[in-house]
């Protein structure tokens, strides 16, 4: 396993490039929004499929994947339970935003690149299971938090999304030990290789368009950051260690638990009539803090692994 601090530093140097590119109008937020579709619908499924293709099948590895899937569901359940005492005041206009942001992390754009950087294909293999857990729980509990009285369950969004589709294609290929021809596997691998740079460049443009001054004045965001970046990952690492989880699987779970609040925070805020500005500031500030907390959390997990 590679140094977490070094790998996070590399990722955020790419974020800095994206930040600068936006400021000089070379790669702007408008361009990034169009690129998000490429990242979400093409690159993300490819990186998941590629991770399955690069893992040689064995019953032990298959068992590890399903164990990882169970742990990722447990991670979200732990987050929901630990979060119960927080943001309970009824009528608080920002409480749904804060609650969602403190539970649901950026498991696609942040966890997968970081897992690949720290653990390689094995890390993506484990963390891709987190996309299944995330989508199942965010489109049930998460939507309920954000929608409130307007909650309506949507099976289509639960099942038909890039993360789940990537696993739906890659997992059977892995379990059946299918030897995919190089002419197909190589393009998938090349597209998957774009994930880290593209995701971090987009994130840089996002930070460049956030009012960094006013976001530091919102006190509730600090509580979100404390819970999402420290309380949750440390609790999960200790719990999973007590359960006997170790090695790369423990570190992969720590990565998924330690990433900052997900972009769905402001997307759901827009859809359900909440304050999108506050949602954007929350995601941005928690993301800034994660620059310092993620290396520490992952290093802690590596020491426990």
What are the residue ranges of the model-derived segments?
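Alpha-helical transmembrane segments of multi-pass small-molecule/ion transporters
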Residues: 1-305
């Amino acid at each position: 396993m590679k140094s977490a601090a070094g790998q996070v530093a590399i990722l955020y140097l790419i974020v800095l490039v994206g930040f600068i590119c936006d400021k000089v109008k070379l790669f702007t937020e408008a361009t990034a929004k169009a690129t998000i579709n490429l990242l979400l619908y093409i690159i993300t499924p490819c990186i998941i499929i590629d991770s399955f293709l690069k893992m040689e099948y064995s019953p032990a590895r298959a068992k590890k994947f399903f164990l990882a899937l169970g742990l990722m569901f447990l991670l979200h359940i732990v987050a929901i339970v630990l979060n119960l005492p927080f943001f309970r005041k009824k009528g608080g206009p920002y409480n749904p935003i804060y609650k969602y942001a403190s539970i649901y992390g950026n498991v696609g754009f942040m966890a997968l690149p970081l897992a690949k950087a720290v653990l390689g294909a094995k890390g993506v293999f484990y963390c891709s299971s987190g996309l299944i857990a995330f989508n199942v729980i965010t489109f049930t509990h998460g939507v309920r938090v954000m929608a409130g009285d307007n909650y309506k369950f949507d099976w289509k969004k639960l099942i038909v999304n890039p993360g789940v589709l990537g696993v739906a294609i890659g997992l059977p290929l892995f379990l059946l030990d299918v030897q995919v021809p190089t002419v197909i596997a190589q393009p998938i691998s090349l597209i998957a290789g774009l994930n880290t740079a593209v995701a971090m460049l987009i994130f840089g443009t996002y930070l460049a368009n956030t009012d960094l001054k006013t976001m530091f004045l919102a006190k509730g965001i600090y509580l979100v950051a404390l819970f999402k970046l420290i309380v949750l990952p440390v609790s999960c690492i200790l719990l999973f260690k007590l359960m006997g989880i170790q090695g790369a699987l423990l570190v992969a779970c720590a990565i998924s638990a330690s990433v900052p609040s997900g972009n769905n925070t402001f997307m759901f805020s827009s859809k359900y009539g909440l304050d999108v500005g506050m949602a954007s500031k929350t995601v941005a500030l928690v993301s800034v803090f994660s620059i310092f907390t993620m290396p520490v959390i992952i290093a802690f997990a590596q020491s426990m692994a």
